[in-house]
């Protein structure tokens, strides 16, 4: 049954959903990687699609920018449409010198300056982590394709334009691999409602040095990331038998 933000019916979504921030990226993923594609959502322009990848039913839908937006869509997909696994696929900014442009980062955990998980967890710190099997499958999928990935902590920021640039030094000290805006929220939603989640990001810019990828470089690395995500789903299916 449709929700206030998703005009689909039960069964329209697969049990696994890839979620980029940009709904046009969702459209690109569906048109480039999936077959027999059907559009299943267009409320507020947040496009969602379902198709097949190598015969496996998979959905893809945008989640917008920031934890409040992605939390709405993740929650409704899980509680109203039976989604079991969410893979966020997006971009991040690096703060460490050893993390390079175009690196693919798998978010094993996600720190945040948001208070949403404290609200969920009775004002205590909650360790927002990805599902282990999904993480392992993504690493294995990358290795099978000959791609190197970095695995570690992300930082999910509430503000894109931060008033506290000194925080980047703290992130660097604590080994944060990338800064984005959603992973901690999605991990919190998945935990609250009994689902599983993973975040895979490509490094699109270096926050400290100011380096940025070109549009062509972003597209190539983005496609590598999507293939890792899709192949990891197939590996997960093999484990379930």
Curated annotation (Swiss-Prot):
Its keywords, alphabetically, are: Glycosyltransferase, Transferase
Record-linked InterPro entries: DeoD-type, Nucleoside_phosphorylase_CS, Nucleoside_phosphorylase_d, Nucleoside_phosphorylase_sf
**Record function comment:** Catalyzes the reversible phosphorolytic breakdown of the N-glycosidic bond in the beta-(deoxy)ribonucleoside molecules, with the formation of the corresponding free purine bases and pentose-1-phosphate.
Name the family the entry cites. Belongs to the PNP/UDP phosphorylase family.
EC number of the protein: 2.4.2.1
- Broadest EC class assigned to this enzyme: transferase
Protein name per Swiss-Prot or TrEMBL? Purine nucleoside phosphorylase DeoD-type
**Can you quote a single GO CC term?**
cytosol
Q: Where does phosphate bind?
A: 21, 25, 44, 88-91
Which PANTHER family does this entry report, sorted A to Z?
PURINE NUCLEOSIDE PHOSPHORYLASE DEOD-TYPE, URIDINE PHOSPHORYLASE
A GO molecular function term, named singly, is: purine-nucleoside phosphorylase activity
